C-alpha cells in the first residue's frame, strides 16, 4: 500500500528508514507495531513512524483474511471483477488477489521482482495501488476479460427487538414503549442500556426489557 510522507524523517537506528516530506512510501506491514510501519523507499526498507505519513485509501486490502473467507465474501457480490487483496496464507510476506468471475472466485499470486516491484504477468508496478488502478482497465486474466471493480458494500438488515414489558421513561432521552412493541436497535454497545427507535421516537431503553426477534419491518 502507498503512503505519502507528511514530514521529513531522519533515521536514528539501523532498522529505520529516512524520507522527505512528499515522498511516496510503500508500506509493507501495518501490524508490526502500533506506532511503526515497515516500508520501502527507492529499494531500501526499514521502519517508519506511523504519525509521519498519511495512507492512501485501500479499501480493497483485507490483510490476513483466509482464502475461504475471501471466496465466501466475493461469492455474494453481483458483478464480475469484484476483488480484494489479502496476505498470502502459503507464503507469508506475499500477497494474493482474489477476483469474482461468473460463479467462481479466481486467485492470482502477486509477484515481486528483485527490485521490489509488483506484477501479475509482465507489467511491473511500484505499489499495490498502482497495480490495482492499472487492472481496472486492463484484464487481470489472460483467458477472460476481467477488470477489477470495488466490492459493493451489502447493507446490513436492521436489528429489531420486541418489548417483554411496558416501559415508561423516567428521564429525558429514554424511549417509552408497550409490551409487544417492536423496537429498531440503533446502538447496542452498552450492556445495560440500548438506543432504539419506536413509533417515530428515539431514545435509550433497558436491555432486559426486550428480547431479540427476526423481523423485517
UniProtKB/Swiss-Prot annotation:
UniProt-recorded Gene Ontology molecular function terms: epidermal growth factor receptor binding; phosphotyrosine residue binding
Any one GO CC term of this protein is: Golgi apparatus
Membrane spanning segments where? none
In this chain the SH2 domain maps to 60-152
GO annotation (BP), single:
regulation of MAPK cascade
> Which controlled-vocabulary keywords does the entry list?
Cytoplasm, Endosome, Golgi apparatus, Nucleus, Repeat, SH2 domain, SH3 domain
Which parts of the sequence belong to the SH3 domain? 1-58, 156-215
> What family is this?
Belongs to the GRB2/sem-5/DRK family.
Question: What is its quaternary makeup?
Answer: Associates with activated Tyr-phosphorylated EGF receptors and PDGF receptors via its SH2 domain. Also associates to other cellular Tyr-phosphorylated proteins such as SIT1, IRS1, SHC and LNK; probably via the concerted action of both its SH2 and SH3 domains. It also seems to interact with RAS in the signaling pathway leading to DNA synthesis. Binds to and translocates the guanine nucleotide exchange factors SOS. Interacts with phosphorylated LAT2.
Functionally, this protein is described as follows: Adapter protein that provides a critical link between cell surface growth factor receptors and the Ras signaling pathway.
Q: What is this protein called?
A: Growth factor receptor-bound protein 2
Specify the species: Gallus gallus
Amino acid at each position: 500500500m502507498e503512503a505519502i510522507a507528511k514530514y521529513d524523517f531522519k533515521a536514528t537506528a539501523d532498522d529505520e528508514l529516512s524520507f522527505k516530506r512528499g515522498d511516496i512510501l510503500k508500506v509493507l506491514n501495518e501490524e508490526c507495531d502500533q506506532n511503526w510501519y515497515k516500508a520501502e523507499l527507492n529499494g531500501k526498507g526499514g521502519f517508519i513512524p506511523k504519525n509521519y505519513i498519511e495512507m492512501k485509501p485501500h479499501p480493497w486490502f483485507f490483510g490476513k483474511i483466509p482464502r475461504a473467507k475471501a471466496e465466501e465474501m466475493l461469492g455474494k457480490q453481483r458483478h464480475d471483477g469484484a476483488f480484494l487483496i489479502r496476505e498470502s496464507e502459503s507464503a507469508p510476506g506475499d500477497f494474493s488477489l482474489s477476483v469474482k468471475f461468473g460463479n467462481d472466485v479466481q486467485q492470482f499470486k502477486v509477484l515481486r521482482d528483485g527490485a521490489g516491484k509488483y506484477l501479475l504477468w509482465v507489467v511491473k508496478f511500484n505499489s499495490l495501488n498502482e497495480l490495482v488502478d492499472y487492472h481496472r482497465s486492463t484484464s487481470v486474466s489472460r483467458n477472460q476479460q476481467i477488470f477489477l471493480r470495488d466490492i459493493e458494500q451489502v447493507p446490513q438488515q436492521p436489528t429489531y427487538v420486541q418489548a417483554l414489558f411496558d416501559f415508561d421513561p423516567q428521564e429525558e432521552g429514554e424511549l417509552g414503549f408497550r409490551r409487544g412493541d417492536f423496537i429498531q436497535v440503533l446502538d447496542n454497545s452498552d450492556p445495560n442500556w440500548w438506543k432504539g427507535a419506536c413509533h417515530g421516537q428515539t431514545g435509550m431503553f433497558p436491555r432486559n426489557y426486550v428480547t431479540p426477534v427476526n423481523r423485517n419491518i
